[in-house]
Structure formats: structure tokens, C-alpha cells
A protein has these predicted regions:
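Short, conserved beta-strand element in jelly-roll/cupin
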Residues: 120-137, 191, 199, 221-225
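Double-stranded beta-helix
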Residues: 138-204
Length: 263
């Protein structure tokens, strides 16, 4: 359970670390689910690193319905309740899950970005939970710009070639050059052990380095009371084919793809 201090920090900074939020058994379930996903990726899977990268950055999305370990952790652990408390929401809806595996030696960074501009969702009550099943040292962990969730939406770009495939070029402000001016930003980051999780707002700017050792993580994206469907004229990441025909713009995401998971 998150306390008042963590709730205040989440709303101020847009990211908090919660230690020991998952039990050893729950971490094992997540690990088993990740390994199942690696062995049999969905058709949504991708490799987000270059062919000449000595490691590999694997991603896959929206597998909770096919991988029972994922669904069990989402529904029976405390992460949905914690997300609800942090968002100040009366209920929590699952948006999607996301597996991110950087194999040892991966050079590919995760560049600075916000998550929500890639999505088909509007609303301020949002929360992602990043759950590692391996120890994560400082150089490989997620970094966050404190308070950036309170600022504007920033231009989403492809991670490897920095193309604007979503919002039209010039329609959103570009990201500042955080790496060149790190001293000008309050950057939050935590070394993590299995069982620890980072909860962050979908507009919080975040990034991560490569991986000197294997880094397997499971991320769960939750939505709160004010989240609504925001159809886009382009392919979102992840994509929900046919949803635009079933939910009008501005409608709550009341759909089997997005089940209520708390209370």
C-alpha cells in the first residue's frame, strides 16, 4: 500500500519508487510470463535495437489475455490498487501491458520521451508500473524528469531514427535536449531489486541507458476515472485495430480490451 508521502511525491514529481510491492512468488510469475513471451512472441513484438548492436532490445505488447501469469499478477497483486491511490481515482482500468527486455551488452538507449502521445487516450489520471525481475543498476534503470508530467505534450518520435510518425511535424513542441543539459533538470532514478517497482505518470519524461547485464521488465499501464478514448489519424503504439468503430471519441474506455481491475 502506498502512503500519503508517496501519493504527494507522485503528484508533484510524476514518478515514485515503491519497494517490495511484489512478493517473491509474484516476481516469479512475472519472470515466467516474460520467458513465455520471449519463447513465443506475439505479432506485435519488435526488436528496438540495430542489427549491429551486440545485445538486443525486445519489446512486446498486449499479452495479458494470452499469458496467464501476467493476468494473474495484474488482477491479484497490489499494483492496481496502488496505481488507483496514486492517481486519486475511484477505479482502475487496465490499458495494456508491455514487455521490455534488454539483453546483456545492449547499447541501444531508450531515448527521452513521454508515453501518452503514442497512445489513443486522453485524460490526466494515468499510471504506468515498471516491474523488473532482475536487479537493475543505476546505469540501466529508468530516469525521470521530475515534474515534467505537469508540462505540455511533447513530440513523440521513433526511437532509432527520430521520425515523427504520430503527430504531424511541428504540431507539438519538441523535447528539450536533456542529455546535453542534465544539470538544468531534476532527474530521478533508483537502483532496483526484484519486487521493487516504479510508478509514473504517462506524461512524465523518462529514458534509460543500455544494459551491461540482462534487464527484463514488465510494464503495466493503468487508467483512472477521467481517461477517454482519443482516436488518432495514425497508427498508435500499441495499436487497437477496430476500436474506433466500437468506441466514439471522448467515450470512457468501457470495453473488454480494457477491463476494470480495481477495486
Amino acid at each position: 500500500m502506498v502512503d500519503a508521502q508517496l501519493i504527494e511525491a507522485f503528484r508533484r514529481d510524476g514518478a515514485v519508487c515503491v519497494r517490495g510491492v511484489l512478493s517473491a512468488d509474484e516476481v516469479m510469475l512475472v519472470e515466467q510470463g516474460i520467458e513465455r513471451n520471449l519463447a513465443a512472441p506475439s505479432d506485435r513484438a519488435l526488436v528496438a535495437s540495430r542489427d549491429n548492436d551486440p545485445g538486443r532490445f525486445f519489446e512486446d505488447f498486449c499479452n495479458w489475455g494470452a499469458i496467464g501469469e501476467f493476468e494473474r499478477v495484474i488482477r491479484t497483486s497490489g499494483i492496481a490498487a496502488d496505481a488507483g491511490d496514486l492517481m486519486g481515482s475511484d477505479f482502475v482500468r487496465l490499458f495494456h501491458d508491455h514487455v521490455l527486455v534488454k539483453e546483456a551488452g545492449t547499447r541501444q538507449r531508450t531515448p527521452w520521451h513521454q508515453d501518452q502521445p503514442y497512445y489513443n487516450v486522453d485524460g490526466s489520471q494515468t499510471c504506468s508500473v515498471w516491474i523488473p525481475v532482475d536487479p537493475v543498476p543505476r546505469e540501466s534503470t529508468l530516469e525521470f524528469v521530475a515534474g515534467s508530467h505537469l508540462g505540455p505534450w511533447l513530440m513523440p518520435r521513433t526511437f532509432m531514427d527520430q521520425q515523427a510518425k504520430w503527430f504531424p511535424e511541428g504540431s507539438l513542441q519538441d523535447l528539450p535536449d536533456i542529455e546535453a543539459n542534465r544539470d538544468e533538470f531534476e532527474i530521478l532514478a533508483w537502483e532496483l531489486e526484484p519486487g521493487d517497482s516504479v510508478f509514473f505518470h504517462m506524461l512524465t519524461l523518462h529514458a534509460a541507458g543500455g544494459a551491461t547485464r540482462r534487464r527484463r521488465a514488465f510494464s503495466v499501464r493503468f487508467l483512472g476515472d477521467d481517461a477517454t478514448h482519443a482516436p488518432r489519424a495514425w497508427k498508435t503504439s500499441p495499436e487497437f485495430p477496430g476500436l474506433v468503430d466500437e468506441l466514439p471519441a471522448g467515450a470512457p474506455l468501457e470495453h473488454p480490451l480494457f477491463p476494470l481491475v480495481w477495486p
